Amino acid sequence: MTKQTLTQLEQHDLFLRRHIGPDSNQQQAMLNFVGAESLEDLTAQIVPESIRLSQDLSIGDSCGEAEGIAYIRGLADQNQVFKSYIGMGYYGTQVPNVILRNVFENPGWYTAYTPYQPEIAQGRLEAILNFQQVSMDLTGLDLASASLLDEATAAAEAMALAKRVSKAKKANIFFVADDVFPQTLDVVKTRAECFGFEVVVGPASEAVNYELFGALFQYTNRFGQITDFTELFATLRAKNVIVTVAADIMSLVLLKSPGSMGADVVFGSAQRFGVPMGFGGPHAAFFVARDEHKRSMPGRIIGVSKDARGNRALRMAMQTREQHIRREKANSNICTAQILLANMASFYAVFHGPDGLKTIASRIHRFADILAAGLQAKGVSLVNSTWFDTISIKGLDVAAVNARALAAEMNLRFDADGTVGVSLDETTLRTDIDALFDVILGAGHGLDVAALDAQIVGQGSQSIPAALVRQDAILSHPTFNRYQSETEMMRYIKRLESKDLALNYSMISLGSCTMKLNAAVEMLPVSWPEFANMHPFSPLDQAKGYTQLIEELSTWLVNITGYDAVCIQPNSGAQGEYAGLLAIKKYHESRGDAHRNICLIPQSAHGTNPASAQLAGMQVVVTACDKQGNVDLDDLKTKAAEVAGNLSCIMITYPSTHGVYEESIREICDIVHQHGGQVYLDGANMNAQVGLTSPGFIGADVSHLNLHKTFAIPHGGGGPGMGPIGVKSHLAPFVAGHVVVKPGRESDHNGAVSAAPYGSAGILPISWMYIKLLGSQGLKKSTQTALLNANYVMKKLSEHYPVLFRGRNDRVAHECIIDLRPLKEASGVTEMDIAKRLNDYGFHAPTMSFPVAGTLMIEPTESESKVELDRFIDAMVSIRAEIAKVESGEWPVDNNPLHNAPHTMADIMDPEFDTRPYSREVAVFPSAAVRTNKFWPTVNRIDDVYGDRNLMCSCAPLSDYE
């Protein structure tokens, strides 16, 4: 029997071996092929010595899955999840188990990427289209987006849209009603300051007294009052004011729509449609506008088009509005949104249907009526005379009520002026109303819920004015009226899932996206009620588990990045960019350098960089790159000197977006610092740094970290994400604060960038588990394996395709770019043809035409085995052989497997297929690997131009179901 130590038998590194794709034998074979003796040798060949860390990270040793779960269970148990009546945009909800199990906890849904390849994403595109339909039906407006990050940032986007489209061009004031949620006002003020807008806050009726470009109202307001805005909106619109409304999605089931009152834009959180509170997120925001504003909408929009066979197909519409194309001229910097959560909300609406939603909303409203009736019967004064779910009370002994509430393990809303608020939700039971009477009135009140209910039924409810009761039908489309049994719902979800290619089927080698394993053990705690059901504004002494987890994660991220502090709040990478630039902006202002507003950005940068700079009120100056893809130092020196007096910062990605470690990175930092600027190092490629180097060690001042890339949070088909920022100590006082929750940091006074103080805190356990389980050595080995995999793929493919950029020793970093332009010239085969043909081989295409047009950028993460890498390489080699047949004339340019890709079942069943110059087998079974595990695209290549020219962003017409 083999002699093994107890340490070996304990297998503390088992998770590491399961996270990393290639086993030891595969790693050695790959090292032999690329010409390196070991991972350390390969690292030395690739990473410039001047930036290599001399010490290991201080994270600790790796641990086993059971040990990690036990530790985080201990953290979860420290959270005291009281019954929450705080409201303020966050509510208890019952996640249907059929959605929890089959969507939220299903890698077929949470590991997919944003649907840039729509032919292999028709399932989630349909679910998102359903979300848009729900949004349009409930708001009464024409066109909805595919989700934004949260309600508060959606408000900021609404303000920006209002300025873009308002005909009141000379106006610079945005009015905000004084009864909106405070976190919404906080985020709006932060954004307005960057844009140079003046924000005026006051009673809604006073909006008519100002020269405005836009105005924001809450429906229902933070105190629960329901207001008929019809006349006010008409008056404002007559003055060319763009009217925006923050609305409660559940209330809209019963209430007159804001669109019918005359609103231009309506937005809000979809959280209470079956998405847990999660201590603040992640949640999807809906955003809906009049059709005339469609070109100014922020974020992604799903539209209906047709495929090559003329069949209905879905795709992302009007992408020319977005940051990856328009850069600093984009409507928004939004990239990752909240697609997984939007899909959950849409499935919630599908599962309950219009009748089920009305029952839920009516039950919530009835409980509010009963609570109000009982309190008023005892002489309690209410602030609001109308309500849907929220009662605000004045004149109480606040200290006594709070003491009784805490004793009963419930949280109420306590305002600074002594008002006490109670917001009811889907989870409220009649026993909860009894308990609320006890807490608010004290014992011996004698109130009976059943008697109060009978009284309301007999007399009728007046809490929703008759003029504000919804009269029009909602969700009449068949999709929302046929899946109310769990069997049908389960099959509908599965049917959509089967149309999509996600990581549970094959490698997704998207460059700059880091589609690594999202291990099941990392995902488990997210569903635990101790993490899922915590309100973000709960007293912090009830959230000790969360606060300890956040502190530990922040400490680890500080160590990994080489910075001095971390701010967790930004809930996407793009928001992290914005937050980091704001910190730089405020730092300059604190030194009397408010004029420093120029941001240098290399021409190869990701589109979010210039879009975020514009969002932060900066002027973008583009610097050149040389033929090797590196920053042109001469041009940088010239530009930095020219703008030295106004230089704010540079935004640079490392390793570069060209997939190499630039040797001159420290010199770049020095040049910018010498001219008074700060260095923002984009963390998109952090997966090539962890344990080997760090932004702080390199010389940067601030970075965002994509937790949904480097630190294992799944992409969710387009979100959720997290973009915390790391900063040097001089920037720490200038990171985001929050108006509601103030944990006692020096940045507490700053404005917020997200609705919740800790952003999408509900998914932080994923990154915590990832780091905890891997430990210092595991994190480093993951990075080294990512380098190995990329260089293995690069060297294999270089025999068939030109590789565009390489670094020292002819190596790449964690990704490589193959140049398809020579092939296109010689054969007429485009990068699009190759991308779609990969679908036939069972692969999602690599990143297409970024950062260079006519290329594919490939990032095989550390989680992919040599077997999977070889399967991808074989597919690319086979495709090269197919291109050769087009080059030789054997196959026509306009009739070959690449031009006609992807192929569907309908194609091979078509008798006319025999007229093609290639066989059915070549079309759909181009390799032996495909025969054993075939992924079938459900539509042919989609016509993008038709979709934008014939814009339709709602569910299919009823005729499609006849």
Curated annotation (Swiss-Prot):
CDD domains: GDC-P. Gene3D superfamilies: Aspartate Aminotransferase, domain 1, Type I PLP-dependent aspartate aminotransferase-like (Major domain). It catalyses: N(6)-[(R)-lipoyl]-L-lysyl-[glycine-cleavage complex H protein] + glycine + H(+) = N(6)-[(R)-S(8)-aminomethyldihydrolipoyl]-L-lysyl-[glycine-cleavage complex H protein] + CO2. InterPro entries: GcvP, GDC-P_C, GDC-P_N, GDC_P, PyrdxlP-dep_Trfase, PyrdxlP-dep_Trfase_major, PyrdxlP-dep_Trfase_small. GO terms for biological process: glycine decarboxylation via glycine cleavage system. One of its GO terms (molecular function) is pyridoxal phosphate binding. Its EC number is 1.4.4.2. Its cofactor is pyridoxal 5'-phosphate. The glycine cleavage system is composed of four proteins: P, T, L and H. PANTHER family: GLYCINE DEHYDROGENASE (DECARBOXYLATING), GLYCINE DEHYDROGENASE, DECARBOXYLATING. This is Glycine dehydrogenase (decarboxylating). It comes from Shewanella baltica (strain OS223).
